[in-house]
């Protein structure tokens, strides 16, 4: 539903129409939509498109296997892959789409896929900042995770990752004005130890931390306000055995990376 305000038809069907109506007939179309009903709508919308079409769950698939391995499968066969270096189970769908596209378009060897899957770099998506730096110094022995996701799908994916962690997670959030602030926070209110709201520097379209807090209802924990990225990270890092997680906007993550 990102950027739906720009659309005349603000329904799933309207979004699918805008996404598919101008697609050219090409060599390949790969779709990673996991919702079967939506995938069927997309497939129907592409009836007259002459591209070779490949749909997740139908033409290719990926599953978690034992001991951290993952199993990829398509018409070319199965590949047992090592655990990827991306955090979050939601990335498996993205990985499978990349593999499907590569195997259909290029003569990629299985061994190259196995090597590549352990060397993926994806900035700002459950990215852990590990190298010595200004912000890493603030968290000390704790972990610092950043994610620029700003929609409900992102908050669901990040919160699912949070649930699987052994450490307490302290959330730092800054968002733009036009996002679903309540819906975003709702996924975290019962799974994180604390929530700190901050302004996004240098962004006129960002919601202020005060307005953000006033909009939130039914959050059964104290919501803190911090005056800067550094202050919020330092405050959340006073606890030991902690994950400090900064989320809510790619603009915010850009500022974090600039500081780092």
Positions of predicted regions on the chain:
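Nucleotide phosphate-binding/pyrophosphate-handling subdomain across enzymes
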Residues: 1-3, 75-194
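Acidic, Mg2+-coordinating active-site environments of NTP-dependent enzymes
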Residues: 1-81, 95-114
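Hydrophobic side chains in well-ordered alpha-helices
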Residues: 19, 42, 158, 184-185, ...
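Structural beta-sheet core signal
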Residues: 30, 171-173, 197, 246
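C-terminal helical cap/extension that packs against the catalytic core
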Residues: 34-52, 66-68, 139-146, 152, ...
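A structural preference for short, hydrophobic beta-strand core positions in alpha/beta folds
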Residues: 55-56, 128, 224-225
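Active-site-proximal loop/hinge segments that shape catalytic or ion-binding/gating pockets
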Residues: 249
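Active-site-adjacent alpha-helix immediately C-terminal to a catalytic or transition-state-stabilizing loop
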Residues: 254-260
């Amino acid at each position: 539903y990102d950027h739906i305000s720009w659309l005349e038809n603000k329904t799933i069907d309207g979004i699918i129409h805008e996404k598919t109506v101008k697609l050219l007939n090409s060599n390949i179309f790969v779709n990673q939509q996991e919702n079967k009903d939506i995938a069927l709508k997309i497939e129907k919308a592409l009836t007259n498109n002459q591209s070779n079409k490949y749909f997740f769950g139908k033409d290719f698939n990926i599953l978690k296997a034992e001991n951290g391995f993952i199993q990829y499968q398509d018409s070319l066969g199965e590949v047992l892959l090592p655990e990827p270096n991306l955090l979050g189970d939601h990335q498996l769908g993205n990985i499978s789409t990349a593999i499907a596209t590569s195997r259909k378009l290029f003569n990629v060897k299985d061994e190259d896929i196995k090597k590549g899957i352990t060397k993926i770099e994806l900035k700002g998506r459950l990215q852990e900042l590990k190298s010595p730096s200004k912000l890493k110094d603030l968290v000390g022995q704790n972990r610092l995770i950043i994610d620029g996701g700003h929609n409900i799908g992102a908050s669901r994916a990040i919160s699912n990752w949070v649930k699987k962690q052994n450490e307490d997670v302290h959330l730092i959030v800054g968002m733009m004005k036009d996002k679903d602030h309540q819906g975003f926070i709702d996924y975290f209110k019962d799974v994180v130890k604390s929530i700190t709201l901050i302004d996004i520097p240098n962004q006129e379209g960002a919601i202020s931390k005060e307005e953000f807090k006033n909009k939130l209802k039914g959050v059964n924990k104290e919501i803190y306000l911090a005056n800067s990225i550094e202050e919020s990270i330092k405050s959340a890092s006073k606890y030991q055995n902690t994950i400090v997680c900064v989320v809510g906007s790619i603009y915010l993550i850009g500022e974090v990376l600039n500081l780092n």
